[in-house]
Each structure stands twice: as structure tokens, then as C-alpha cells.
Amino acid sequence: MATITVPVNSKPFLKTLNALGGRKAGAAIDILEPIYLDSTTDPADPVVKVADSDPAVAATSDVIGIAVTKAETGSQCVYAYTTGDVIDFGGSLTVGDNYWLVGSTIDNAYSSITALDYVVKLGYCNEDGDFVVNIIVQGEVK
């Protein structure tokens, strides 16, 4: 099991030229955290928050993207959401590994997903050691 950790002072950047999403954060969000759209608090002004695979609130596992900037509550969060987006953040990932939503983190071990938590694939590591966005919300629990 290896949870993705962003090196200190890392400034992730996209190696692809796809559009990025941007929306107001409803809570603090860190770089490379999976996010979901919270429209229950204020349906007229939905915000993004850190996703979670906990089955108690299914909507929190409906991942829409991976944060590429830090955001405080009320500030803008920029995120990658297009399948195939390549994020280089200066970390060392294992080529070929798949990455999953485990609680509110990104982890490369499917076995780390707790029984009855939602199964969400977030991406994989390409041959250059970069994170590639490939979000698949399976809509089922483990």
C-alpha cells in the first residue's frame, strides 16, 4: 500500500493541454486530493470538497477531478478532470500501478479499500512515473 504523497514545495503541472476545471472550495483542499461537487449545502452555488469512499454519504465518492492547486474554504480550486490528463508533481510512483480512492486519499492498493466503501478508480502511473487521470466511479461498494 502506498498513499500518494506530494513532495515538499512541489508544484504539480499538467503535461497535457486539456481544459481544467475550477470552482469555489467548500473546505480546505490540498494538491492531488480527489474532489467531489457538493450541491446539497447550497444548490444555487455548489462547491468542491475532498472526496471520501465512506458509504455513509454516497455523494462524497462521486469524484469529479483531482486538485492541482491548494485551496482554502471560499477560494478557487483548480482541478484536472479529463481522462488522460497527465500530472507531474515530482513524486515517485510505480509504473503501471492503478490508484484508488481509499477514504479521502489516493492509494495504489485495491486491497486498502475498506469493505463496504465505494470503489472509485482515480488513475494510474504511466511509463514516465507521472499520475494519469482516469476517474471511474463504479457506483458499487467493495
Residue ranges of each PLM-predicted region?
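Glycine-anchored, exposed beta-strand/edge motif detector
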Residues: A2-K142
